[in-house]
Amino acid sequence: MNVFLSKYINGVDKKSRVTVPANYRAVLGKELFNGVIAYPSIRNNCIEVCGIAHIEKLRKMIETLDPYSEERDAFETMIFGEAVQLAFDGDGRIILPQSLMKHAGIEEQACFVGKGIIFEIWQPKNFEKYLSYAQNIAHEKRLTLRNAH
Protein backbone atom coordinates (compact mmCIF):
# COMPACT_ATOMS: atom_id res chain seq x y z
CA MET A 1 0.00 0.00 0.00
CA ASN A 2 1.31 3.46 -0.84
CA VAL A 3 -0.49 5.57 1.75
CA PHE A 4 0.28 6.46 5.34
CA LEU A 5 -2.43 5.04 7.61
CA SER A 6 -3.15 4.75 11.32
CA LYS A 7 -1.88 6.34 14.50
CA TYR A 8 1.10 5.25 16.61
CA ILE A 9 2.69 6.63 19.76
CA ASN A 10 6.44 6.07 20.14
CA GLY A 11 8.89 7.21 22.77
CA VAL A 12 11.49 9.90 22.10
CA ASP A 13 14.85 9.21 23.74
CA LYS A 14 17.24 11.73 25.31
CA LYS A 15 19.07 12.11 21.98
CA SER A 16 15.77 13.11 20.27
CA ARG A 17 15.57 9.81 18.40
CA VAL A 18 12.20 8.29 17.60
CA THR A 19 11.30 5.17 15.64
CA VAL A 20 9.22 5.77 12.52
CA PRO A 21 6.51 3.08 12.30
CA ALA A 22 7.58 0.17 10.09
CA ASN A 23 4.62 0.47 7.73
CA TYR A 24 5.42 4.17 7.19
CA ARG A 25 8.99 3.22 6.30
CA ALA A 26 7.61 0.62 3.88
CA VAL A 27 5.61 3.32 2.07
CA LEU A 28 8.82 5.34 1.74
CA GLY A 29 10.80 2.30 0.56
CA LYS A 30 10.58 3.36 -3.08
CA GLU A 31 12.18 6.75 -2.38
CA LEU A 32 15.70 7.60 -3.50
CA PHE A 33 16.59 8.90 -0.03
CA ASN A 34 16.59 6.47 2.93
CA GLY A 35 14.74 8.79 5.24
CA VAL A 36 12.13 11.53 5.30
CA ILE A 37 11.71 15.24 4.83
CA ALA A 38 10.17 17.05 7.80
CA TYR A 39 8.99 20.63 8.20
CA PRO A 40 6.77 22.57 10.60
CA SER A 41 3.12 22.29 9.66
CA ILE A 42 1.56 25.54 8.47
CA ARG A 43 -1.88 24.22 9.52
CA ASN A 44 -1.34 22.79 12.99
CA ASN A 45 1.19 22.62 15.81
CA CYS A 46 2.77 19.45 14.49
CA ILE A 47 5.47 18.29 12.11
CA GLU A 48 4.57 17.34 8.54
CA VAL A 49 6.64 14.51 7.10
CA CYS A 50 6.89 13.18 3.55
CA GLY A 51 9.18 11.76 0.93
CA ILE A 52 11.01 13.58 -1.85
CA ALA A 53 8.21 12.89 -4.35
CA HIS A 54 5.73 14.92 -2.27
CA ILE A 55 8.21 17.78 -1.83
CA GLU A 56 8.49 17.88 -5.63
CA LYS A 57 4.69 18.16 -5.90
CA LEU A 58 4.72 21.03 -3.40
CA ARG A 59 7.51 22.72 -5.34
CA LYS A 60 5.48 22.55 -8.55
CA MET A 61 2.39 23.95 -6.83
CA ILE A 62 4.34 26.81 -5.27
CA GLU A 63 6.04 27.62 -8.58
CA THR A 64 2.62 28.42 -10.09
CA LEU A 65 2.44 31.47 -7.81
CA ASP A 66 3.80 34.87 -8.82
CA PRO A 67 7.56 34.69 -8.09
CA TYR A 68 7.45 37.99 -6.19
CA SER A 69 4.25 37.42 -4.22
CA GLU A 70 4.10 37.36 -0.44
CA GLU A 71 2.33 34.01 -0.58
CA ARG A 72 5.05 32.33 -2.59
CA ASP A 73 7.77 33.76 -0.38
CA ALA A 74 5.95 32.61 2.75
CA PHE A 75 5.40 29.07 1.43
CA GLU A 76 8.99 28.76 0.22
CA THR A 77 10.30 30.00 3.56
CA MET A 78 8.05 27.88 5.76
CA ILE A 79 8.23 24.67 3.73
CA PHE A 80 11.59 24.62 1.95
CA GLY A 81 13.51 26.93 4.28
CA GLU A 82 12.45 25.06 7.40
CA ALA A 83 12.54 21.54 5.91
CA VAL A 84 15.18 19.06 7.01
CA GLN A 85 16.16 15.70 5.58
CA LEU A 86 16.20 13.09 8.32
CA ALA A 87 17.95 9.82 7.54
CA PHE A 88 16.86 6.51 9.07
CA ASP A 89 19.39 4.78 11.26
CA GLY A 90 19.75 0.99 11.31
CA ASP A 91 16.79 0.71 13.70
CA GLY A 92 14.40 2.85 11.63
CA ARG A 93 14.82 5.90 13.85
CA ILE A 94 15.19 9.55 12.94
CA ILE A 95 16.62 12.36 15.04
CA LEU A 96 14.09 15.15 15.48
CA PRO A 97 15.69 18.61 15.43
CA GLN A 98 14.97 20.70 18.52
CA SER A 99 13.30 23.41 16.40
CA LEU A 100 10.71 20.94 15.10
CA MET A 101 10.19 19.39 18.53
CA LYS A 102 9.59 22.85 19.98
CA HIS A 103 7.12 23.74 17.20
CA ALA A 104 5.09 20.59 17.94
CA GLY A 105 5.57 20.60 21.73
CA ILE A 106 7.13 17.12 21.59
CA GLU A 107 9.16 15.94 24.58
CA GLU A 108 9.05 12.29 25.65
CA GLN A 109 6.48 10.86 23.24
CA ALA A 110 5.55 11.42 19.61
CA CYS A 111 2.23 10.56 17.98
CA PHE A 112 2.53 9.54 14.32
CA VAL A 113 -0.66 10.19 12.34
CA GLY A 114 -1.12 8.87 8.80
CA LYS A 115 -2.64 11.39 6.40
CA GLY A 116 -2.51 9.51 3.10
CA ILE A 117 0.34 11.10 1.14
CA ILE A 118 2.05 12.54 4.24
CA PHE A 119 2.17 11.79 7.92
CA GLU A 120 2.31 14.12 10.88
CA ILE A 121 4.13 13.93 14.19
CA TRP A 122 2.28 15.42 17.16
CA GLN A 123 2.62 15.79 20.89
CA PRO A 124 0.08 13.08 21.89
CA LYS A 125 -2.18 15.24 24.09
CA ASN A 126 -2.28 17.98 21.45
CA PHE A 127 -3.34 15.40 18.86
CA GLU A 128 -6.15 14.11 21.09
CA LYS A 129 -7.51 17.68 21.32
CA TYR A 130 -7.23 18.09 17.55
CA LEU A 131 -8.87 14.70 16.95
CA SER A 132 -11.98 15.83 18.78
CA TYR A 133 -12.11 18.98 16.62
CA ALA A 134 -11.49 16.97 13.42
CA GLN A 135 -14.26 14.51 14.31
CA ASN A 136 -16.74 17.39 14.58
CA ILE A 137 -15.66 18.91 11.26
CA ALA A 138 -15.74 15.52 9.49
CA HIS A 139 -19.22 14.87 10.83
CA GLU A 140 -20.49 18.29 9.72
CA LYS A 141 -18.89 18.05 6.26
CA ARG A 142 -19.40 14.31 5.60
CA LEU A 143 -21.73 14.88 2.64
CA THR A 144 -19.02 16.75 0.73
CA LEU A 145 -17.20 13.43 0.21
CA ARG A 146 -20.15 12.04 -1.70
CA ASN A 147 -19.64 14.72 -4.35
CA ALA A 148 -15.85 14.46 -4.43
CA HIS A 149 -15.58 11.81 -7.17
Curated annotation (Swiss-Prot):
Q: Which GO terms describe its biological process?
A: negative regulation of DNA-templated transcription initiation
Q: Which PROSITE patterns match?
A: SPOVT_ABRB (PS51740)
Query: Which keywords are on file for this protein?
Result: Cytoplasm, DNA-binding, Repeat, Transcription, Transcription regulation
Q: What is its main location?
A: cytoplasm
Which parts of the sequence belong to the SpoVT-AbrB domain?
7-54, 83-126
CDD domains per UniProt: MraZ_C, MraZ_N
Q: Where would you find this protein in the cell?
A: Cytoplasm, Nucleoid
Q: Which domain of life is it from?
A: Bacteria
Kindly list the GO molecular function terms attached to this UniProt entry.
DNA-binding transcription factor activity; transcription cis-regulatory region binding
- GO CC term, one of those recorded: cytoplasm
Q: How does this protein assemble?
A: Forms oligomers.
UniProt lists the family membership as follows:
Belongs to the MraZ family.
Could you identify this protein by its name?
Transcriptional regulator MraZ
GN (gene name): mraZ
